[in-house]
From Swiss-Prot:
GO terms for biological process: L-arginine biosynthetic process. Its EC number is 2.3.1.1. The gene is argA. This is Amino-acid acetyltransferase. It comes from Salmonella typhi. Keywords: Acyltransferase, Amino-acid biosynthesis, Arginine biosynthesis, Cytoplasm, Transferase. Its main location: cytoplasm. It catalyses: L-glutamate + acetyl-CoA = N-acetyl-L-glutamate + CoA + H(+).
Length: 443
């Protein structure tokens, strides 16, 4: 027998090895819509998921059931009800949702369990675990419309999920979750996948749609989108009446996930064999990645940044979280400020007021844009301000806060008496605000 030399295989393997090493031990959340599950290529997707598991990747698979639920409703002559593009899940619908989700769970579990059959890894056992890892709560009533059993996530037991992942299991999550009162609720797969990815600090969230990612006006694949660009694409699709396609649902979740610390979100096709492997183990991938903007920078503020700082801090001032600062005051103190900017938008700021004689500094006016509070921007600012204080020869750093006491305590600050403040600061202390004083050694 003459063996054929396949140089493409050799080159492909050489290129994939670094990614195999990089991905091992990382957590990936995979979102499978009902459209992907009923497609002929689904068996290949399941096999590829099994392969990822065999490479040491920690996998959470979240499945949806939208087309299966709609088919169930049609078969039972029960008209689907939507309000603001969200399904209203009445009692009859809930039973049909549970039926569809239950059948899919059994089917996916069975397929994953035998996904390595007819491969060199045949005989390797895959544990697939499902459970009440999420607690739901009702969406409630909106504009007089009761969403009934449509819900959202209240909390996630990430410790229990991590234990299963540590034990080598694939965690499988469906669209039905229970509340603390024992009621069942219908949730969207994109919300479950997004919140799981954030809570588990996943390296990646991966979704499937009918096309190979997001396309441009000429039909070409856009290989990378920043969250702001992905959000603009969502708004564009919604303006065209597209609220529930696989693309728009995944992009909504990907924007939130990226802004909350998930490094990369990948959108690929469920129709093309091998999309998952090509996306993860090749240099250029095959679909669209949503990634954090590379233009982010942390720097000292200038007079041109005052407008952005004011826009960031005004809502917090109105809520009484920050002390109000006028534009004139900001102009005089702008050299005290450090900002984090993304795409020319100020998303975080903090100021350092040194008291040189006492060798102590105050970190003040700490603010982070709501879209970025789940990430590490506050810690980045704290590290930068502490470094600036050390360069000035300061030995201690203090803050006055009414709301963020625990956050600072978790980062080495301890509550102290007002008497430990610098004399000039002590005279300005506002006893009506009753801010707590916390202090840390700079070392």
């Amino acid at each position: 027998m003459i063996k054929e030399r396949k140089t493409e295989l050799v080159e492909g393997f050489r290129h994939s090895v670094p990614y195999i090493n990089t991905h091992r031990g990382k957590t990936f959340v995979i979102m499978l819509g009902g459209e992907a599950i009923e497609h002929d290529n689904f068996s290949s997707i399941v096999s590829d998921i099994g392969l990822l598991h065999s490479l040491g990747i920690r996998l959470v698979v979240v499945y949806g059931a939208r087309p299966q639920i709609d088919a169930n409703l049609a078969a039972h002559h029960h008209e689907p009800i939507y309000h603001k593009n969200t399904r209203v899940t009445d009692a009859k619908t809930l039973e049909l949702v549970k039926q569809a989700a239950g059948l899919l769970q059994l089917d996916i579990t069975a397929r994953l369990s035998m996904s390595l059959n007819n491969t060199p890894l045949q005989g390797a056992h895959i544990n697939v675990v499902s459970g009440n890892f999420t607690i739901a709560q009702p969406l409630g009533v909106d504009d007089g419309v009761d969403y009934c059993h449509s819900g959202r996530i209240r909390r996630i037991d990430e410790d229990a999920i991590n234990r299963q992942l540590d034990n080598g299991a694939i965690v499988l999550m469906g669209p039905v979750a229970v509340s603390v009162t024992g009621e069942s609720f219908n949730l969207t797969s994109e919300e479950i996948a997004t919140q799981l990815a954030v809570k588990l600090k996943a390296e990646k969230m991966i979704g499937f749609c009918s096309s190979q990612g997001v396309t441009n006006s000429e039909g070409g694949i856009i290989s990378e989108l920043f969250p702001n660009e992905a959000q603009a694409r969502v708004e564009e699709l919604e303006a065209q009446g597209d609220y529930n396609s696989g693309t728009v649902r995944f992009l909504r979740g990907a924007v939130k996930a990226c802004r909350s610390g998930v490094r990369r979100c990948h959108l690929i096709s469920y129709q093309e064999d091998g999309s998952l492997l090509q996306e993860l183990f090749s240099r250029d991938g095959i679909g669209t990645q949503i990634v954090m903007e590379s233009a982010e920078q942390i720097r000292r503020a200038t007079i041109n940044d005052i407008g952005g700082i004011l826009e960031l801090i005004r809502p917090l001032e109105q809520q009484g979280i920050l002390v109000r600062r006028s534009r004139e005051q900001l102009e005089m103190e702008i050299d005290k400020f450090t900002i984090i900017q993304r795409d020319n938008m100020t998303i975080a700021c903090a100021a350092l007021y040194p008291f040189v004689e006492e060798k102590i500094g105050e970190m003040a006016c700490v603010a982070v844009h709501p879209d970025y509070r789940s990430s590490s921007r506050g810690e980045v600012l704290l590290e930068r301000v502490a470094a600036q204080a050390r360069q000035m020869g300061l030995r201690k750093l203090f803050v006055l806060t009414t709301r963020s006491i625990h956050w600072f305590q978790e980062r080495g600050f301890t509550p102290v008496d007002i008497e430990l403040l610098p004399e000039s600061k002590k005279k300005m202390y506002n006893y009506q605000r009753r801010s707590k004083v916390l202090m840390a050694d700079l070392g």
